Amino acid sequence: MLKQRVITALILAAILLAKRLDAFSPELARKGPRVVIYEGSNKLVTREDKPGLKGYAVGFESLVDFVHSSAPLNRFVEQVVREEVKMFPRQAIRELVANALVHQDFEASGQSVMVEMYTDRLEVSNPGLPPIKVERFIDEFRSRNERLAELMRRMRLCEEKGSGIDKVVHLAEVYQLPAPDFRTSETRTIAILFAHQDFAEMSKSDRIRACYQHCALKYVSNERMSNQSLRERFKLPESKAATASQVIGATKDAGLVKADESDTTSTRYARYLPFWA
């Protein structure tokens, strides 16, 4: 038992602090995060393929800097703040990469954390399926690798339990981006940040996802979603109140939000809760 604990401690130290992961073992080297930058919106042309060689703590900030610097510019936010702004917020990239590192399944052989950037989106994925439903990422937290998570929190590489995804959703709203998407494949968990889209360009599913995430974010902030707050999220004028109501109605029909009946029965001043509240 003591020997196993020592081995586990050594592996943790190596995966966090190693100057080169491949100096320890081929298996550990394959756990380094890999960054791939594509020329277009598909995988046909690769601009850069950069395997992660350093331990997570040693190479984390430089990895995030590289991904952020490779992102396209956000001309829509630039017009407001009058300075160069990258499409994907650095803090959001940081949270998603840290989250993927912490929650990966280390027993999945031949797989690693992947950061893939396209012209219209950023995908961060990790081996292993989440222990909770993706719809609950905003309000729930359950770590697959608690010791690694605790060490990374102490090193200030990731947030306190459960707050990282909240920040990603909030930053998407601030930077006028579509709602991030959280998905699962057969073996991986995938988080996607999308490039800017005007409301008119968003699909119905994009609008529903944004409405649900906005509602959940409001709830965990001890607030409530309203027609007005959703219009502000989508940058819609007051004259588009009916449009916002249609989005709320579609999100209710999808079973993702519900009316807060404890507040008011008035349709005009209605407040909404996520389905799990």
Task: Give the residues covered by each predicted segment.
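C-terminal regulatory or interaction extensions
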Residues: 1-277
